[in-house]
Amino acid sequence: LMMNQFYDYYLSNNDEGKKIEFVEKNRTISFKINEIMYISSDKNYQDIVTKDNKIETVRIPLSTLENKLKNDGFIRVHKCYIVNQIYIRSILNEEIKLTNDITIPLSKKRRDEVLKEYLTYSRNNNSMII
């Protein structure tokens, strides 16, 4: 319950106005950054998954998205996944569980870096580390 209270508080006090726009040939898609839970990759196509379980597919390299979002609390956890850290519930050996119980793979080579960055992120955002 405490985690959910923090989570709701953080979301309501986060920078609500900050958005990211994806501009493609024939369309523009806009998201509030704090509504994106994670991004999964299938080669050149990326699925952007929101907290409402809406999925939009864009054709932008995952590395480009990683660079654009890394200063907004997103972290690359696998060659095919970028996760918004506000939605991380737990980090286990080879997976990350999100607040909606979705499990994202965590690559072994990125594990230590992800843990270190998540702890720093959590401390900077008033999480209690036990």
Give the residues covered by each predicted segment:
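Conserved binding/recognition cores within well-folded domains
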Residues: 2-99, 103-106
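Short, surface-exposed, low-complexity cationic segments
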Residues: 115-117
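Intrinsically disordered, low-complexity protein-interaction/activation regions
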Residues: 125-130
